[in-house]
Each structure stands twice: as structure tokens, then as C-alpha cells.
């Protein structure tokens, strides 16, 4: 289970929320290979595929911080079948390395992450939120649908130079991350706990707040120096 302090937008009070009976399932396969292409060239490959999901509906209890009254007690949250948002379900990467004379070398790599989803929130999938707030089918789906993130691609490169002192080694590396400079790549996301109130004349409607996203770093450069002895 889990506990947290929240602002319950539907009740209009700060509350403590406890979620119990969370069930998760994770399974997958992975494979990797290192290939020696030539005396100074090598290629590393790796891929994985998995299924990470919630396997049952947890129970949500919300207690008001104002007077310790129960806002919602052991409400069923329809999260069964939702996907965990912490990891992509498909990944692949390849790295080409060159080790030149006098300690020079470089690496170039490409990565892919797919079947990614935002982290679902139990509160908005309870009947109090999804059915009371989602008075139309479209709005109900907005509260309960889990958003899928776009596939992500990365391209990186590094140039390095090693200096040897007996059994010791000093290595200076210049690393270039996100060579394509794609600043719109979403790294992760999670659903908001908040609910928007929308007034239209005398009618009051509810809608979920927008998903919170974390974006990958834009094109970046790093200079590192390491010493092994």
C-alpha cells in the first residue's frame, strides 16, 4: 500500500489518502551480444521486451485533514489492466566502439524505448471522481483512460583519450548526448491528482488536470576525467 497527503479537489479539502491492495505483475525477456567486428572495432547490441501492469483494483481511503472525517472509504479504483509508468516495455540499443592507437577512441550509440505510459493515479479512477466528475462518456473516459507516451529515440557519441602510467590509466572523455537536439522527447509522465471545475451558466462540470511531463535533456556536452590505479 501507499499513503500521501493530497488536495482533494472534488471535496475541496486537504486530505490524507491511503491505497491498499495494490497488485502488480512484471515479466519479460532480454538479450545482449558483444561482437568483435575487427581488431579495433566492436559492436554491442541489447534488447528487452516485457509486460508491467496492475493486476487488480486497489482500495482508496481518503480522510479529511480538517476534521478527520471520511471523504471516501475503501473505494474501488479501477486500475486493473493499467500499465506501470516507471519503465518502457520495449527497449533496444546498439553501441559501436573504435579503439585506436595511442589511446584514442570513440563510441557512438543509439537507443529506443517504446510502449511507454504515464503513471496512473488511483484516486481519479474511483466512482466518486470518475463517475461523479465524468457525467458524459467522453469525460468518464478522460478520467479513466491511461495515456500512452510516444516512442523515444536517442543518439549519443563520445571521444576519449587514455594515458597510461605503468598499471595506472588516466582517461579524458568528451561526451555528446542527444545529438539530434530533440527537446520535445518526453522522458516520463504522471497523471495529476487535481480536478478542474468548469462552470457553464448554472451547470458545473469536472475535468482532470493535464498530465505532468518530464522532458529529456536537450543536446548536452560533458567532459569527464577518470583515473584508475
Where are these regions (language model features)?
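Short, small-residue-biased leader/transition segments that mark boundaries at the very start
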Residues: 1-6
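Solvent-exposed loop segments that connect transmembrane elements
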Residues: 7-17, 57-80, 122-143, 189-210
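Gram-negative outer-membrane beta-barrel transporters
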Residues: 12-124, 226
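Alpha-helix initiation/capping motif
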Residues: 20-22, 85, 148, 211-214
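Residues that define the transmembrane beta-barrel architecture of outer-membrane proteins
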Residues: 23-27, 86-92, 151-155, 168, ...
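A cross-taxa feature marking solvent-exposed loop/turn segments within ectodomains of secreted
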Residues: 38-40, 150, 165-167
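C-terminal beta-barrel architecture of Gram-negative outer-membrane proteins
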Residues: 85-164, 188-189
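C-terminal beta-signal and adjacent terminal beta-strands/loops
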Residues: 112-130, 161-229
Amino acid at each position: 500500500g501507499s499513503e500521501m497527503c493530497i488536495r482533494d479537489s472534488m471535496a475541496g479539502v486537504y486530505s490524507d489518502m491511503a491505497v491498499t491492495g495494490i497488485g502488480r505483475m512484471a515479466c519479460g525477456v532480454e538479450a545482449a551480444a558483444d561482437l568483435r567486428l575487427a581488431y579495433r572495432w566492436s559492436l554491442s547490441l541489447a534488447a528487452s521486451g516485457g509486460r508491467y501492469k496492475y493486476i487488480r483494483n486497489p482500495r482508496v481511503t481518503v480522510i479529511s485533514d480538517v476534521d478527520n472525517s471520511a471523504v471516501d472509504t475503501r473505494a474501488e479504483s479501477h486500475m486493473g489492466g493499467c500499465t506501470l509508468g516507471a519503465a518502457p516495455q520495449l527497449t533496444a540499443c546498439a553501441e559501436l566502439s573504435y579503439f585506436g592507437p595511442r589511446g584514442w577512441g570513440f563510441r557512438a550509440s543509439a537507443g529506443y524505448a517504446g510502449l511507454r505510459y504515464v503513471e496512473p493515479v488511483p484516486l481519479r479512477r474511483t466512482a466518486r471522481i470518475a463517475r461523479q466528475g465524468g457525467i458524459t462518456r467522453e469525460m468518464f473516459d478522460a478520467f479513466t483512460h491511461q495515456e500512452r507516451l510516444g516512442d523515444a529515440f536517442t543518439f549519443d557519441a563520445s571521444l576519449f583519450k587514455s594515458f597510461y602510467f605503468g598499471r595506472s590509466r588516466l582517461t579524458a572523455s568528451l561526451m555528446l548526448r542527444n545529438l539530434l537536439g530533440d527537446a520535445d522527447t518526453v522522458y516520463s509522465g504522471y497523471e495529476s491528482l487535481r480536478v478542474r471545475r468548469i462552470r457553464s451558466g448554472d451547470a458545473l462540470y469536472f475535468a482532470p488536470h493535464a498530465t505532468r511531463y518530464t522532458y529529456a535533456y536537450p543536446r548536452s556536452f560533458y567532459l569527464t576525467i577518470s583515473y584508475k590505479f
